[in-house]
């Protein structure tokens, strides 16, 4: 990552151009990440010349995303952010009873992959987010006194389709910035093989989630056109390599669509897909997700009893599986529901 590519590199360069000692940049990052100061004018520990230069470069605020709409439910908050060019993205904060806070952030404005059950793609693809725009979603929550316990790239867009993703992860794991452990971060993918391979090499401890949704190649290609480019069989081989290299569990997301992918044959095919892969096969975990309805798709919600039966079939075959407990569906903040066209 080039030093001046992200805002933090630019901040360091600005201090250097002013011929200030290195500790001034350290004071700046501490003001952001220890004192949670979002306004450069309020960073009184910094020389006035540096504060003015920072405002001239970035504007008065550290964060570049502006919240313009918010919806809350009992355990979820969905925020609509506007970017400096007027584009919009959504992010979701989740709060659990134990006090744990998790945040689902976006990596793209819209999505180009056209998964039939997902509302995000209906808005079309606008552009990739920069590394700063990705991480600034979290800065907003942090500046508003939230605890960044865990992060998931499960918002709008396919994370591995955005080259800026890895710079964003570097920022998140930099001990002088966000300082997050790799194991507190989860990246979800529809199966972009080069992205999985790069993650394996560069961030082996980051959690990986793979969106399966059908164990049959032809049906998966129909539901998820990306399967024609990266067939399931090839993706699974790549996931095997990831597990062998990292020793880490891979989560396989499976949205339950009534009458589409919920049959006994589907369960048996999943069992066949995960069996006899090798000594590491126990590190695959199936995450069954109740479908969240939207006005953008025509699929139907599967009953909880049917989902539990599907899960039971997998478990009887010694497949690790659970049914995901979801929050935020009532405010369209759950899996597959993010679509900023619904707002305002």
UniProtKB/Swiss-Prot annotation:
CC cofactor note: Binds 1 [4Fe-4S] cluster. The cluster is coordinated with 3 cysteines and an exchangeable S-adenosyl-L-methionine.
Keyword Isomerase: no
Keyword terms: 4Fe-4S, Antibiotic resistance, Cytoplasm, Disulfide bond, Iron, Iron-sulfur, Metal-binding, Methyltransferase, rRNA processing, S-adenosyl-L-methionine, Transferase
One MF term in the entry's GO annotations: rRNA (adenine) methyltransferase activity
Top-level EC class as recorded in UniProt: transferase
GO annotations of cellular component type: cytoplasm
Predominant cellular place of this UniProt entry's protein: cytoplasm
Methyltransferase is among the record's keywords: yes
The protein's required cofactors: [4Fe-4S] cluster
GO biological process: response to antibiotic; rRNA base methylation; tRNA methylation
PANTHER family registered for this protein in UniProt: 23S RRNA METHYLTRANSFERASE, RADICAL SAM CORE DOMAIN-CONTAINING PROTEIN
UniProt miscellaneous comment: Reaction proceeds by a ping-pong mechanism involving intermediate methylation of a conserved cysteine residue.
Stated role: Specifically methylates position 8 of adenine 2503 in 23S rRNA. Confers resistance to some classes of antibiotics.
Family statement drawn from the similarity comment of this UniProt entry: Belongs to the radical SAM superfamily. RlmN family. Cfr subfamily.
Protein name: Ribosomal RNA large subunit methyltransferase Cfr
Lineage summary: Bacteria, Bacillati, Bacillota, Clostridia, Eubacteriales
């Amino acid at each position: 990552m080039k030093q001046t590519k992200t805002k933090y590199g630019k901040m360091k360069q600005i201090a250097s151009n002013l011929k200030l000692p290195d500790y001034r940049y350290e004071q700046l990052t501490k003001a952001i990440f220890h004192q949670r100061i979002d306004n450069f004018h309020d960073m009184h520990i910094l020389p006035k010349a540096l504060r003015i230069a920072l405002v001239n470069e970035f504007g008065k605020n550290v964060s570049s995303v502006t919240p313009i709409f918010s919806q809350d439910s009992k355990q979820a908050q969905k925020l609509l952010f506007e970017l400096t060019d007027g584009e919009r993205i959504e992010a979701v904060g989740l709060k659990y009873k134990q006090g744990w806070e998790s945040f689902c952030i976006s990596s793209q404005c819209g999505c180009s992959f056209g998964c039939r059950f997902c509302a995000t793609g209906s808005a079309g693809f606008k552009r990739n987010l920069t590394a700063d725009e990705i991480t600034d979603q979290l800065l907003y929550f942090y500046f508003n006194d939230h605890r960044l316990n865990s992060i998931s790239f499960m918002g709008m867009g396919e994370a591995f389709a955005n080259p800026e993703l890895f710079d964003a992860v570097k920022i998140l794991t930099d001990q002088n910035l966000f300082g997050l452990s790799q194991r507190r971060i989860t990246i979800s993918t529809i199966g972009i093989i080069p992205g999985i391979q790069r993650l394996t090499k560069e961030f082996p401890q980051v959690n990986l989630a793979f969106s399966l949704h059908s164990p049959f190649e032809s049906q998966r290609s129909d539901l998820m056109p990306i399967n024609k480019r990266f067939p399931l069989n090839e993706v699974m081989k790549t996931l095997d390599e990831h597990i062998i290299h990292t020793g880490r569990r891979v989560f396989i997301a499976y949205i339950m669509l009534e009458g589409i992918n919920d049959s006994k044959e589907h369960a048996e095919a999943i069992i066949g897909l995960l069996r006899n892969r090798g000594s590491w096969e126990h590190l695959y975990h199936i995450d069954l997700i109740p479908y969240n309805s939207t006005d953008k798709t025509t699929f139907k919600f599967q009953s909880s009893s049917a989902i539990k039966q599907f899960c039971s079939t997998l478990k009887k075959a010694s497949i690790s599986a659970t049914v995901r407990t979801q929050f935020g569906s009532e405010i369209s903040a759950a899996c597959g529901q993010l679509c900023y066209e619904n707002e305002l």
